[in-house]
């Protein structure tokens, strides 16, 4: 069994910092726009709800074969948080697959932040013992599809819960 731990990932403009409970207050503001839930459903979390969620997330998966990896996206020049990226790494077909996702606050969208963060995450995961990346994207979410494509993922014919499965095979490490 391979367990992977989140480490800081540095890109040209961003620091992807391993998630800490202390990020909840600032992230609640970043993620406060209800429009962020247009494709996923739900509503923005309060700081207290987000703190509780982050406590669960940083506690790790109850399944020792699964690694929960979560980062906040920090804009280095502005020294502020702008979103999150995550990877759930689990055994699949004799190897490890990372299910990845990203979200960038409305105020920071349209600046290539999600693309840069997803590319940084994909590059880092490619240095881990992960054989494949997977993302599930709503078919109408064109911006998220563009991020997935920029991170090297391609859409498949598979669907899950109304979303298209995107995949990228990695060179085994």
Each model region followed by its residue ranges:
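Generic recognition of short, well-ordered alpha-helical segments
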Residues: 31, 99, 113-116, 146
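Conserved active-site alpha-helix within GNAT-family acetyltransferase domains
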Residues: 115, 140-156
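Conserved G/P- and acidic residue-centered "switch" motifs that form tight phosphate/ATP-binding loops
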Residues: 79, 112, 141
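GNAT-family acyltransferases
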Residues: 1-107, 120, 124, 128, ...
């Amino acid at each position: 069994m391979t367990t992977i731990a989140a480490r800081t990932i540095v890109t040209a403009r961003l620091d992807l910092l391993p998630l800490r409970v202390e990020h909840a207050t600032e992230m609640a503001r970043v993620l406060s726009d209800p429009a962020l839930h247009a494709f996923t459903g739900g509503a923005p979390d309060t700081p207290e709800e987000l703190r509780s969620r982050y406590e669960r997330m940083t506690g790790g998966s109850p399944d020792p074969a699964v690694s929960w990896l979560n980062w906040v996206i920090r804009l280095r020049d502005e020294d502020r948080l702008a979103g999150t990226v995550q990877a759930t790494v689990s055994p699949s077909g004799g190897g490890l697959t990372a299910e990845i996702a990203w979200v960038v606050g409305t105020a920071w969208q349209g600046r290539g932040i999600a693309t840069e963060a997803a590319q940084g995450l994909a590059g880092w995961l490619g240095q881990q013992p992960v054989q494949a990346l997977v993302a599930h994207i709503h078919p109408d979410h064109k911006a998220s599809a563009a991020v997935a494509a920029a991170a090297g993922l391609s859409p498949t014919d598979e669907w899950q819960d109304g979303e298209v499965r995107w995949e990228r095979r990695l060179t085994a490490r």
